[in-house]
Amino acid sequence: MLSDTICAIASGQINQAISIIRISGPNAFKIMEKIFLGKVGRSMEITFGWIHDDNQKIDQVLVLWFAGNKNFVGEDTVEINAHGGVLNTNLILELILKTKLARLANPGEFSLRAFLNGKIDLVKAQAINDLIHAEVKVQHQAALNQFLGKSSNFIKNLIEKIEEIIGIIEVNIDYPEYDDVEILTSDVLLPRINQLLADFDQLIKIANNSRLIYQGIKTCLVGAPNSGKSSLLNILINENKAIISEIPGTTRDVVEGNFVLDGLLFKLFDTAGIRKTTEKIEQIGIEKSYESIKKADLILHIIDASEKNRQNLDLKAKTRPDQIYLKIYNKSDLLENQEEFKDEILISAKYQKIENLLEKIKSIFAFLGKNKEFVANSFQISQIELGKLAILDAKTSLESGFGPEIAIVDLRIAWKELKTIFGRVDDENLLDSIFSKFCLGK
């Protein structure tokens, strides 16, 4: 994989002031000798000159050459800074490919090479991708913490604890006569296994909060028809996306939109009004409403406060313990007396008076902003959970009467699952899957 030369537009396919075309691999310098009028300077120096095709000038550019190990990728790399028109940039890329000394890079292949060349570990590689795709400040900070290695320390501490136990067991097995190492019997080992499980549980609990940061907080707006769900969605996303009508059952499909509150990304789903109906299309919409409730992190149950005979929808009974459920009483502008709702969240979507709702949501999710150190993406959370399962298997072995020499097999599996987070990956297909989600030219 590392023996050939790759190239790509690193700055995206858009019109811009300056575009960057990146070439990396053993033929990078040879390619520049063919297409650059002038001499490429020494490593880390910028050279000014023309890109040409058989002496036909294409563009006047700045060329920066990074020798060998003195760059992000870890191999000879050239970056061409050209005028940023899409056509102009692609003409230069086509010219590079025309030399037949390089091929077009796959998405994320520069980062993959940096990983394979030992310039970054897998955590940093994924952090770069997360940094690029960050939509809000909290996501940006989480990705930056990953890149700086702050999150890695939590996992590395677990790895070290497992390594220590494995090391002692191996000495007990291979050198039973060695007196300077404690003897780990099943009775001595079991409390340590339980402590490891507690450490895993704590890490998983914190890591699961990361999903809300990286993927956004899935927020479902539900309630009876004409309760004001669509009006509230339009206010939150600052766009007339959902149809507002006096006719019940207007919203028949799930309408989506995003909004940012206190630096956090909320992904909104406005659902069909829930009521008893014989109308088949409306019934399908209501079924989709219940599906959205199942997927939500935050459920906002919108109720028309002005209705004297309000439909009693027991939606809270359909929620899980890990979901947050809020009752929101709308249409405060139609109330003569608001005393009945003094302890409730009362809003007026019509007049955009929703401050108390926003403050309530901010207070609920304030803890996400406080976790400055440890965050994990879905791949890392999956590996931590696999590690915990292996530790549970070790505990089961010990409780079933097997000795440490059997439990060590599961301890090694747990160790491997955690090491995979940093790049101890034996499956090349897994690597391809991870890096294929990266941007072209990265």
Curated annotation (Swiss-Prot):
The keyword Chloroplast does not apply. Its cofactor is K(+). Residues 216-366 form the TrmE-type G domain. Binds 1 potassium ion per subunit. Disulfide bonds: none annotated. PROSITE patterns: G_TRME (PS51709). It comes from the Bacteria. Mg(2+) binds at residues 230, 251. Keywords: Cytoplasm, GTP-binding, Hydrolase, Magnesium, Metal-binding, Nucleotide-binding, Potassium, tRNA processing. GO terms for molecular function: GTP binding; GTPase activity; metal ion binding. Gene3D superfamilies: P-loop containing nucleotide triphosphate hydrolases (3.40.50.300), Probable tRNA modification gtpase trme, domain 1 (3.30.1360.120), tRNA modification GTPase MnmE domain 2 (1.20.120.430). It is an enzyme of class 3 (hydrolase). One of its GO terms (cellular component) is cytosol. It is found in: Cytoplasm. One of its GO terms (biological process) is tRNA wobble uridine modification. Homodimer. Heterotetramer of two MnmE and two MnmG subunits. PANTHER family: TRNA MODIFICATION GTPASE GTPBP3, TRNA MODIFICATION GTPASE GTPBP3, MITOCHONDRIAL. Belongs to the TRAFAC class TrmE-Era-EngA-EngB-Septin-like GTPase superfamily. TrmE GTPase family. This is tRNA modification GTPase MnmE. It comes from Mesomycoplasma hyopneumoniae (strain J / ATCC 25934 / NCTC 10110) (Mycoplasma hyopneumoniae).
